[in-house]
Amino acid sequence: MLNFFAAAPKGFEYSLAQELTEFGATEIKESVAGVYFTAPLALAYRITLWTRLASRIVLVIYKGSCESAEQLYNAAYCIDWPAHFSNRNTFSIDFHGTGGFINNTQFGALKIKDAIVDRFRDDGDERPNVSRTDADFKVDAHFRNGVITIAMNFSGPSLHQRGYRSTTGEAPLKENLAANMLVRSGWQAAPTTLLDPFCGSGTVLIEAALMAADIAPGLQRNRFGFEHWRRHDKAVWQDIVAEAKARASLGVKRCEIKFYGSDIDSRLVALAKRNAENAGVLELIEFKVANALNIEPPAAEGYLITNPPYGERLGNVSELLQLYYQLGDKFKKEFGGWKVAMLCSDIELISSLKLKADKQMKMFNGALECAFNLYTLHANSTRRDTPVLPEGVDIADIAPAFANRIKKNAKQLEKWAQKEGIDSYRIYDADIPEYNVAVDKYLDYVIVQEYMAPATIPEAVTKRRLSDVLLALPAAIGINPNKIIMKTRERQKGTNQYQKLDERKLELITTEYGAKFKLNLTGYLDTGLFLDHRLTRRLVGQKAKGRRVLNLFSYTGSASVHAALGGAKSVTTVDMSNTYINWAKDNFALNGLQGKQYEFVQADCLQWIRDCNEQFDLIFIDPPTFSNSKRMEDSFDVQRDHVNLLGALVKLLSPTGELVFSNNKRKFKMDIETLTKMNIMVKNIDDITLPMDYKRNPHIHNTWLITHA
């Protein structure tokens, strides 16, 4: 008997152990991402050819404790390597695991390589050569918790590569993951009509057809790891392959199961057909181009097993939520008697089906953790958490309280915004605590920002509420789902003020009291314009005429633009970020503002204040609540440091000058007593700077007018 380890993705262990048991393997023991087993050589060949779930099978040659580099070398040296492969073959070592004396995998691989080469030399042979890319004989080594396992890669290249896939779609599904979906759904145990309405390149259907037609998944592979192993029994292997070929030929002819696949992308459907033809099962599968929402059940009962689009794969989140909701509605109404199995990484999306799951499992699509849910659709199937919606009822009724509130807000604020001369404003700000989001309208786009929920609320609850918000929004405010952008916001905790999201850009031009500003709705957590400072910016513009204006922590320079348009004698704009300084320059150009009187400075604002010896008539500063950027000499906390900051700023203020100080710290407390002793006059001006669209949540808005006493 030989000892083996069958590796597989996390979450496959139970299914793989069951498969190995059915093959006849013994001493089966589940481990992390794989299963140990023993088998005679002939059975090991059969498992390698027929396993639908394993990614790799290795023959364990040595396993023992290892506490030093010397022990590692000795463990590898004691193996009779010339009995396993010829020095005319190339070899490689794939080393996994670190800890203790092994700081990196390269060190471990090098020690084993040295031992192998030395063993060949000491046995009187020339040393074999190492090949890093395409070795004949591959050694697998794993070091964990002081134990070293040295093995031979018995199966060769990853077993999920069956050989039938020509190219992939945008979001390919690995073949062994598709097989595990079929196993865990219960379909493999009782094959029946199978439908995949998001078939992509056809992987789920092809794997199912291979099962139903008794075709070995490894039959089309042209390379295995044991081929250069000196103990390889070629005759036994050829007999097993010949038997598999005979079974496949007979299985296709006898298969009576019907398979149906569709996808909205004609290119993918054509690819699926090519893959099915390569796999020898095209005659068993009916493919067509179709929208999943338009498909009809091809039989009275069957299985619908699919891997629909989700956030990490394809598409806009709000559009996908609508899709999932509509799918759930279609399943409920038209697929009574069917079983549904669905793979999805987003709790929000899968909860939008509004169907009660019989079983919920976890699977990994690569490194991505996914939910794999099973549903039984009865003739009178009901939705979970919501009443069954009669025909014609608005989808916003999923979250009626939220939908009604935001609909009312949007209607009131639209008239106000037109009157004010603005086209970007907030229409909802956690008005209802259960729906803990902010919703901002930017022209004909909407950004939904999810606030971090209290730790006491289960994640599943917050995810479901968020999905309900995104489902209800389009109908409630009359917006296309593809113009809804989702972001997650947390209260600032020791990080920098601005957070970059990705490289994508969705740029718009917004208008505010006659000023124009460039927005980037997707590149950063913030868009380039703080909407709650709208009236503060206008106030700066109203006070700027003929004055020398300084804007610190300027962000994208929007207050500077208002000052310049207001007739400022000069405007100095300072920010630490070169990105935002350039953005500020773009905003000036957008408004036709140019000239030497407009200065842009990229600098650490706190250091710049200390170094500055100029005087200004109007200063606007909106510092971060907290910042510890590597580019700043010191950390900054607005509550802790505001007295010192304002004390330094009034030294730059002309005798009749004014300083507008703003921040967004919750429960900020101005130290008026200390500032008064410093001959600094302080007046809160929240009442004239808090916009109407933010009056529902005034706690984060602090604005002060400061002058010399």
Swiss-Prot record:
Keyword set, alphabetical order: Cytoplasm, Methyltransferase, RNA-binding, rRNA processing, S-adenosyl-L-methionine, Transferase
EC number: 2.1.1.173, 2.1.1.264
Gene3D superfamilies per record: 3.30.2130.30, RNA methyltransferase domain (HRMD) like (3.30.750.80), Vaccinia Virus protein VP39 (3.40.50.150)
Molecular function (Gene Ontology), one example: RNA binding
Record bears the keyword RNA-binding: yes
Domain THUMP span(s) in chain numbering: 43-154
Keyword Metal-binding on entry: no
GO cellular component entries: cytoplasm
Chain's role: Specifically methylates the guanine in position 2445 (m2G2445) and the guanine in position 2069 (m7G2069) of 23S rRNA.
Similarity comment: Belongs to the methyltransferase superfamily. RlmKL family.
Protein name per Swiss-Prot or TrEMBL: Ribosomal RNA large subunit methyltransferase K/L
Organism for this UniProt entry: Shewanella putrefaciens (strain CN-32 / ATCC BAA-453)
